[in-house]
Amino acid sequence: MTQKATILAIFMVVLVLGLETKETQGQEMCHDLIKKTDCDDATCVTLCKQKWNGNGGGSCFQIVNLKSCLCAFPCQV
């Protein structure tokens, strides 16, 4: 009887882990670039939230003399 219970418990653990993995893999992130001449992280986060209805966030990065804001948000917005 204990062997059947062990096999059932292992099967249930694998099933639950498989269902959780399916839910976390479905969330894809999209990106958007806001080009600016100057950028700070607080302003960047605010701009991204305004543009994408409160979803996602942003961070600044610099390419040569141009600082830009890179927004990341769920693709289903």
UniProtKB/Swiss-Prot annotation:
User: Mind telling me which InterPro entries this protein's record contains?
Assistant: DEFL
Disulfide bridge positions per record? C30-C75, C39-C60, C44-C69, C48-C71
Keyword Transcription regulation: yes or no?
no
Q: Name one Pfam family in it.
A: SLR1-BP
The lineage's top-level taxon is Eukaryota
GO-annotated biological processes: defense response to fungus; killing of cells of another organism
Localization in the cell:
Secreted
Does the record carry Signal as a key word? yes
Q: Which keywords does this chain's UniProt record carry? A: Antimicrobial, Disulfide bond, Fungicide, Plant defense, Secreted, Signal
Single GO cellular component term: extracellular region
Where is the major localization of this protein? secreted
**Signal peptide from the UniProt entry:** 1-26
The record's family statement is: Belongs to the DEFL family.
Put simply, this protein is called Putative defensin-like protein 120
Q: Which organism is it from?
A: Arabidopsis thaliana (Mouse-ear cress)
